[in-house]
Amino acid sequence: VTNDEFRAAMSRLAAGVVLVTAQEPPLDPDDPQAPAGEDVGMTATAFMSVSLDPPLALVSLREGSRMDDLLAEQPLWAVSILAENQRHIAGRFAMKGRISDRLLFKELSWTRGESSGAPLLTDALATFELRTEQRVTAGDHTLVVGRVLTARVPGTGGPLLYYRGRYRHLG
């Protein structure tokens, strides 16, 4: 199968859209006065539950991406499931080649996770805080399996979906 054939066939599978977040470690972890690390976010559609006992979920990250590199050194991360009215957030964090995410978080309503320290969208359909249990290289991606530390359902409404190369909603 060619890459184009595979991509075209997989585009027919509707997927939920999530924001994966983590906080970079401080620049000098030995200095308690050192500024906190920067918050980082990435839009993803490959997030799924793996196990109920223990509670595990995974996200698939492009190997060598900024988030893949960060989660290789930072074991705590979070996921916010996006609602249908959060398409702008998905687009904002899907941009490639950006240097900093500081401005991307600036106008969003979020709180810092108590278990992960990562940003959690306050109006997401659901949020998860996770600790990496396993990393598996799979082709050009890394599957990051995390133990779910917290799971909350702060929002209501319908989910944001990704189907045939576009963001969509149910209905």
What residue ranges belong to the model's regions?
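Basic, polyanion-binding surface patches
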Residues: V1-G171
